[in-house]
């Protein structure tokens, strides 16, 4: 059996400085070893060196620990779009930004393939995925609307959701494979198979 993750230490006499991604990584390792349902806040507290009360104050639910990397991924997504010209093909822009959003994801890189395996196998975590990624999906939908003026809002959101599902499917396959190679490369390879074309009402026949 794998050893327990090293504690996320805090300095005595000072307010707790909590690293959400380090706590999330520790929780995911415990879930992979012991099972999600069998791991409580006290277990996560013992693994991180942070009191259960403090953990529950910072995280709205145990499931939220699986998605602590979403804010950083959303920032990478929007920052990448700012560097991309508006006149490049939409599929190229979306692929570049989505890949950038996962390329430096500390949770994916540090937790390894068991992150996606745990999420895929635990219904509570899988059901929380779309809700947790809502800020990321909304940011992607806004960018699609900016690059395709006149496109219906529903279409922009549908395409954004499709890219979210495609990226997660690529990460699931990457995790099941070992994982070997880069998670960003796995996402890039899958998204290259997508060719999104949005027709605005003015362009419709």
PLM features: residue spans?
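N-terminal intrinsically disordered/low-complexity leader segments
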Residues: 1-17, 188-205
């Amino acid at each position: 059996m794998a050893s327990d993750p090293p504690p996320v230490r805090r300095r005595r006499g000072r307010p707790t400085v909590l690293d959400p991604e380090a706590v999330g990584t520790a929780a995911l390792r415990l879930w992979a070893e012991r099972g999600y349902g069998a791991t409580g806040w006290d277990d996560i507290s013992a693994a991180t060196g942070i009191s259960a009360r403090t953990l529950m104050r910072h995280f709205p639910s145990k499931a939220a620990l699986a998605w602590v990397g979403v804010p950083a991924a959303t920032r990478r997504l929007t920052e990448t779009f700012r560097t991309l010209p508006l006149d490049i093909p939409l599929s190229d822009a979306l692929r570049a930004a989505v890949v950038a959003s996962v390329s430096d994801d500390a949770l994916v890189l540090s937790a390894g393939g068991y992150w996606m395996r745990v999420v895929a196998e635990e219904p509570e975590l899988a059901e929380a995925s779309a809700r947790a990624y809502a800020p990321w999906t909304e940011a992607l939908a806004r960018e699609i609307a900016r690059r395709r003026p006149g496109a219906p809002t529903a279409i922009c959101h549908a395409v954004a959701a499709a890219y979210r599902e495609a990226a997660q499917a690529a990460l699931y396959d990457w995790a099941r494979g070992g994982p070997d190679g880069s998670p960003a490369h796995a996402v890039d390879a899958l998204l290259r198979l997508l060719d999104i074309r949005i027709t605005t009402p003015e362009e419709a026949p």
